[in-house]
Amino acid sequence: MYVPCDPINQNRYADIILPPDQKVRLHFASASLDRTAINIVYSHVLNPMVVTRSYMCIEPIELWLDLRALRRGLVCPVDPDTDPTALAVQDSGMVPVNTQIAIVNPETCTLSHVGEYGEIWIQSDACAKAFYGSKQDFDQERFNGRIVDGDPSVAYVRTGDLGFLHTVTRPIGPGGQPVEMQVLFVLGGIGETFEVNGLNHFPMDIENSVERCHRNIVTGGW
């Protein structure tokens, strides 16, 4: 729901979806909202709501990942107290019942193993079917992802985003029973990475490394 002028009245709205173009949590920090009041939605141009945290009633799930393992395509949670270089990531929510997500090696089109990240593929009635008027092979491939050794009748939409699924156990609501759930973590777009000697890198990580290597380098410079 997009409300351009109308002020937010808690008595009128049950759930509001906001695009995370800015730091929404910081913007509303003065309102002293509960950590479960603002929820993340993983949206994609080919599917407006792939996963969501709305109505999960739990605080964001945080993991700290080994950066060296990430470069090799592996997901290795670590203790941030013992590894100060660990990357903090936050979940994007659970997969809706009418959606199927597969984490796939984008080059071999085989399912990624447990402990690996890969391209996020989606199978859902909410997915777009095609780009209007496009006959480009690249566009056709995005809507017709087939998993090697999988069901050939099932076509997936290829998001071009990297991520992984992670299983956690959390109580639902205050005093609730622990429930096992699978949540999606989104790492970023494949087009925003580059490979050197078989290792994956994000430009932002390279820039941060350069900024930390000498005190005279200005952070956030252009």
Where do the protein language model's features map onto the residues?
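Amphipathic alpha-helical interaction motifs in eukaryotic regulatory proteins
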Residues: 129-132, 207, 211
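C-terminal boundary motif of the adenylate-forming
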Residues: 162, 167, 212-222
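Conserved ATP-binding/catalytic segment of the ANL
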Residues: 91-100, 106-115, 119-200
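Basic, glycine-rich polyanion-binding accessory segments appended to enzymes
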Residues: 189, 204, 219
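Gly/Ser/Thr-rich phosphate-binding loop
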Residues: 1-86, 100-101, 107-110, 116, ...
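Acidic/polar loop patches that form or flank catalytic/metal-binding clefts of enzymes
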Residues: 36-39, 154, 218-222
